[in-house]
Amino acid sequence: MSSQIEPDAEAAKQRGNELFAAQDYEGAIKSYSESMKLDPSQWTYPLNRCFAHLKLERWTEAEADATSVIDLDESNAKAWYRRSLARKGLGKFASARADLYSYGRRTRDFKIVVEENSKIAAMEAAIVKASVDSPACRFKFVDTSNHGVGAFATRSFERSELVLVEEPLYTVSEIASPRQIATAVSRLTDDERTELSLLHNTFPDRFDDSFVGIHRTNAIAAGEDSSVLCLRASRFNHLCTPNARYSWHAPSKTFRIYALRSISEDEEILVSYISGRNIYGSSKAQRQARLQSMLGFVYSCTSCTLPSAEQAASDRRRQELTQLWDTVPHFPPSQTAARLNAIARAIRLMKEEGYDADEDDFTNDAAVICAFHSDWESAVYWGIRTYESRVAEFGADSRRAMDEEVLRFLLEPQKHQMAGRGTRKVFKTRV
């Protein structure tokens, strides 16, 4: 009687491990596949095969294997991390980030999250920048029936995905004089000046030089004291509940637009020309006054032309947000729970208003409060929300996402300058 039997799943896995160590990834994949056939309930085998596929840059196969592991064991941190790598390779950048965050929450290894997130950001930015003026461009400009030219998505977007990366035509001081603007324009090529002349000018009677009027109409703030002129970014229209966000990326000196929420193919991509509390904490009348001072005419977006009852409710929400912003810093230490509840209330109001930006205006304060009272779990929770918000709106490789205080809450909340100064308390407030 023959003693020859089919190798069991563990033996096949061991062979696969030996082949993997010898860098025979094809052979390892075959052995791991054999293990999976013998015992499809064991997550170790697809996890190992996923790693071999990653080594061969077979992103689709690696993604499928990691997903099968997650289906078998949702708590498996390695599977989330490896699927993030696979999705980065596939160009599924928003999904790659989401998987990376799942890995971080399970392991608290936020150093890896920050490092890998920066790599994802760099790869995505390079691809998006190269796609402009090509069939792969993520948007197209279309004449609308009621508000001029607008940018419309040629594919769907998820929150945090890049829509545009653009080098500006020129950069000047935010308070540049007409002569300084004219000097910047004079340095452009003839073709660039021709393209610039096609942009809208809302001040034709105010400036003798039409390029100065075009600049005043279309220039965008870049950093604390500069403004830039971008041929493409300037054509995106405004909405007081935008689905995308302007962002100046100082390290690369490029202007970027990020999706703030899901955007469908053929949907118009809309940004806000004003920011912070000037947008989310201002009534319709206040916003329109600011826009008129900037643009020279009354700009009425769909968020400013709601039925009267809805408009009044919107104004109340935004005015309450300003009140919360003003009062949150003044709660005494004895009322920290109420202070956190006020922060959570502000974030919920933003969501009710359909406003998907600037959450970090409140969450960063919450992280400091919790660290002050040595509630490290809550400090990390609010720190994660701050980091994820800034990554989505400014990029993982931006100065705001890489801010030392933000990263401190992820990596070492106990070392924050305010950590442990108050009475130890534990808070349950979450959003």
Give the residues covered by each predicted segment.
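Short aromatic-glycine motifs in intrinsically disordered, low-complexity regions
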Residues: 143-148, 222-226, 289-291
